[in-house]
Amino acid sequence: MKEPAFWRTDGGRGSGALARALLAPLGWIHAWAVARRIRKATPVRIGPKVVCVGNLTVGGTGKTPVTQTLMQRLAEMDLTAASLSRGYGGREAGPLRIDPATHDASTVGDEPLLLARTGQAWIARDRAAGGRAIEAAGGVDLVLMDDGHQNPDLAKDCSIVVVDGLTGWGPGTIVPAGPLREPVATGLARADAVIVMMPDAATEPDWTGLGLSDLSIPVFHAWLEPLAPPPAGKLVAFAGIGRPEKFFDALRAAGGDIGEVAVYGDHHAFNAGDLRHLDALAAAHDAQLITTEKDWVRLPVDIQARVTAWPVRAVFANPGALDGLLRDVMDADMDAGGEAG
């Protein structure tokens, strides 16, 4: 789905304030349901440490690239990590270890398939069952739970909240009145660290505006950095992610010559009609098609060869502090039960 326009406005006449007000009671019910589920749950504790990379809003904040970077840094520390995702958009319920050679996005989801390119990746709609399956398979020091800050089923040793530094928490209203999954104060109270994703290294986060200046937990500044420059020549860029404009802006900032863009809903399943439309746009502009890695893995295999995937990675202003957080997680004594973060 595409985000309603009123999710990303600051209020005022004509900005969706009426829609938010009308939907606010449903948001309160949603927040109550989330809080009740967390309060009533008995989290399952597994042997490997569990670090959750989640957020407080619906839509793209950069969780998957952050998870990839964490997997890489853990590997550099001689630790074996496995990612655990719900598998949104895929048919398989799991628990299932992903094999990129045999699975595709329609079976396991796009984000888990992307994570499987970095390291061991699993899906499980039942996160506790997924954690047990990873533990039973053996050889894993730490599980990176991709999304799940509001899922209490698997006990966490560290909960990291990722937030888009430009859009922040939106207008502060809860789904369906806004992008929040739960109240900000409630979500941050369960967090052990926050990662603020900015457009680049030079753009400093508004710590005060985001309500992060007085937090007693680590707060990191990070951004997405392309692994290669955009292709030369005219481009037609398309994306079906939470915040497609971030992809288009990054392409332009890197020097990409975009003739036209095409926007699809998050996790969109591309069909023959979409591909004909994209081919027509490319022909009209004498351009090359380019998309995100996450979108590229959802394309039919016979189409992938003629579409460029533009990979990015999450880069941290203070990677040493990030490594320190991960070491602290590994060094911490395991509590007898319950949830650390």
Curated annotation (Swiss-Prot):
A Pfam entry, by short name: LpxK
Cellular component per GO, a single term: plasma membrane
A GO molecular function held by the record: tetraacyldisaccharide 4'-kinase activity
EC code: 2.7.1.130
Chain positions recorded as ATP binding sites: 57-64
Reaction catalysis annotation: a lipid A disaccharide + ATP = a lipid IVA + ADP + H(+)
GO biological process, one term: lipopolysaccharide core region biosynthetic process
Pathway(s) of this molecule: Glycolipid biosynthesis; lipid IV(A) biosynthesis; lipid IV(A) from (3R)-3-hydroxytetradecanoyl-[acyl-carrier-protein] and UDP-N-acetyl-alpha-D-glucosamine: step 6/6
Record-linked InterPro entries: LpxK, P-loop_NTPase
Residues that span the membrane, as ranges: none
Principal EC category: transferase
Protein role: Transfers the gamma-phosphate of ATP to the 4'-position of a tetraacyldisaccharide 1-phosphate intermediate (termed DS-1-P) to form tetraacyldisaccharide 1,4'-bis-phosphate (lipid IVA).
Matching NCBIfam families: lpxK
Family: Belongs to the LpxK family.
Protein name (record): Tetraacyldisaccharide 4'-kinase
Taxonomic source organism: Maricaulis maris (strain MCS10)
Taxonomic classification: Bacteria, Pseudomonadati, Pseudomonadota, Alphaproteobacteria, Maricaulales
